[in-house]
């Protein structure tokens, strides 16, 4: 049957979702996923390398004290993460099913190399111009967020999408 709209599902896998691993694996096998992103929002790296910025962002969403922010940071930094073998197994399922793989908040050449090993094809929200350029040099499609474009800057103090587009480092 013909449809006017074809919805596509982007599965965003947070690496500390260890307890959901079996569900993630099952959903990837279901045939309903078109794109999977592997994300790690642990404070102190990626989007939130700057812990002060993380704290300010958290305070913007929730009524928390500095002590509560420190506790949240510690808890997130100490939380279990999926192992490389688990991530690689999920990526393998994605590839077998023709699901595109994206990295998220790339902050270094090392992270890009890690994602190369998973055969990712998309770098979603690289956090610096150097990393965006490196991602493109590695053959990844680079993506910036619409709010970043509209605001003219990243809400978390990272790469400006406008700057990256002007530099030819962003594809979408």
Q: What is each residue range found by the language model?
A:
Residues 9, 100-172:
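Active-site-adjacent C-terminal substructures of enzyme catalytic domains
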Residues 1-106, 147:
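Metal-coordinating catalytic core of metallo-dependent amide/deamination hydrolases
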């Amino acid at each position: 049957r013909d449809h006017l709209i074809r919805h596509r599902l982007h599965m965003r896998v947070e690496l500390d979702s260890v307890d959901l691993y079996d569900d993630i694996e099952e959903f990837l096998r279901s045939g309903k996923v078109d794109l999977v992103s592997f994300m790690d929002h642990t404070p102190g790296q990626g989007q939130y390398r700057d812990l002060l910025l993380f704290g300010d962002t958290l305070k913007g969403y929730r009524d928390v004290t500095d002590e509560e922010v420190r506790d949240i940071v510690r808890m997130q930094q100490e939380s279990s993460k999926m192992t490389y073998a688990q991530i690689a197994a999920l990526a393998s399922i994605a590839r077998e099913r023709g699901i595109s793989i994206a990295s998220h908040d790339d902050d270094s050449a090392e992270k890009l190399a890690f994602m190369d090993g998973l055969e990712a094809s998309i770098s979603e929200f690289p956090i610096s111009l150097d990393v965006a350029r490196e991602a493109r040099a590695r053959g990844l499609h680079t993506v910036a967020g619409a709010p970043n474009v509209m605001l003219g800057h990243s809400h978390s103090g990272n790469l400006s999408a406008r700057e990256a587009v002007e530099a030819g480092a962003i594809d979408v």
